[in-house]
């Protein structure tokens, strides 16, 4: 997967002087791919760090992840946000690097994953940002927020609480419509917890999403369920669908040994 990760403060972009040493450390002589979620601060800071790395002789390519169908523009982005699909980009691009692809090819694989993955999220509760000490938005016990982000951002609309199947349908419909999923498509289905939702409930969402895809004639060839890209203690989940081809499936299946993903070794 990744050779380096650069966290900023909670819900804050890392700075160029944090990104640069990570970039230099990750470079083995063939260059470095930055995988960046599409948030304005992240984009600007990674651009600056890439320029600094290039000045030190390290070639850098950037894959910008913007899989969130909930927004086109927000206070935090120009265009769609990068959310759950980032995990899939990281795994598959990392596998391409591991098999020996050059810098341009690894970046191209990452961009292909981003072009074929879409995500939508829901919150049943807000999260509390540590430096603020208060919930990021107010949500009644009988309400849910559709289209939330991963940094505690509110969603695009608020509706009364529904059962799990109803919520799943609301999340999945815009994802499938935007991807244009049709009969015969092969997909990876990723149900991601936002941090405070029991795993058993995530599998309830997965069951319904897989059923909807089957009804459309799509085949769920690969799946992932769990808490992988979270918003502290937020209760909720996101659904990501990635359209697969033979190469993307092969790269997803390639051995991986990390704290989060582990198979084939």
PLM segments and residue spans:
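Short glycine-rich or small-residue beta-strand-to-loop segments that form or flank ligand, phosphate
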Residues: 2-5, 31-40, 47-50, 61-65, ...
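Mixed-charge interfacial surface used for oligomerization/domain docking
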Residues: 99-204
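Short Gly/Thr/Asp-enriched flexible loops that form oxyanion-binding sites at enzyme active sites
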Residues: 43-57, 76, 201-207
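Extended, charge-rich low-complexity interaction segments
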Residues: 38-43, 91-103, 244-265
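Short, acidic/small-residue loops that bind anionic groups at enzyme active sites
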Residues: 5-10, 54-79, 215-220
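Short alpha-helices
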Residues: 64-105, 109-118
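C-terminal non-catalytic interaction/assembly regions of soluble proteins
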Residues: 174-265
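Glycine-rich oxoanion-binding loops at beta->alpha junctions
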Residues: 2-29, 176
């Amino acid at each position: 997967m990744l050779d380096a990760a650069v966290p900023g403060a909670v819900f804050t972009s890392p700075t160029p002087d944090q990104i640069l040493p990570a970039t230099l450390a990750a470079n083995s002589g063939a260059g470095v791919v930055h995988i960046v979620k599409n948030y304005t601060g992240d984009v600007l800071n990674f651009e600056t760090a890439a320029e600094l790395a290039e000045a030190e002789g390290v070639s850098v390519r950037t894959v910008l992840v913007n899989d969130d169908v909930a927004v086109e523009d927000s206070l935090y982005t120009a265009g769609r946000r990068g959310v759950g699909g980032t995990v899939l980009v990281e795994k598959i691009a990392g596998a391409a690097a591991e098999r020996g692809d050059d810098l341009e090819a690894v970046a191209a694989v990452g961009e292909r994953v981003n072009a074929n993955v879409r995500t939508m999220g829901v919150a049943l509760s807000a999260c509390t940002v540590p430096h603020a000490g208060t919930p990021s938005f107010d949500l009644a016990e009988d309400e849910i927020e559709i289209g939330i982000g991963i940094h505690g951002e509110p969603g695009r609309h608020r509706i009364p609480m529904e059962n799990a199947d109803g919520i799943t349908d609301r999340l999945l419909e815009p994802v499938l419509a935007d991807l244009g999923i049709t009969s015969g498509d092969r997909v990876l289905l990723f149900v991601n917890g936002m941090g405070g939702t029991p795993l058993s409930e995530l599998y309830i969402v997965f069951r319904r999403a897989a059923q909807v895809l089957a009804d459309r004639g799509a085949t769920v060839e690969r799946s992932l369920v769990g808490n992988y890209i979270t918003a502290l203690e937020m209760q909720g989940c996101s659904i990501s669908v990635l359209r697969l081809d033979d190469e993307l499936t092969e790269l997803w299946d390639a051995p991986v040994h990390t704290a989060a993903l582990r198979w084939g070794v």
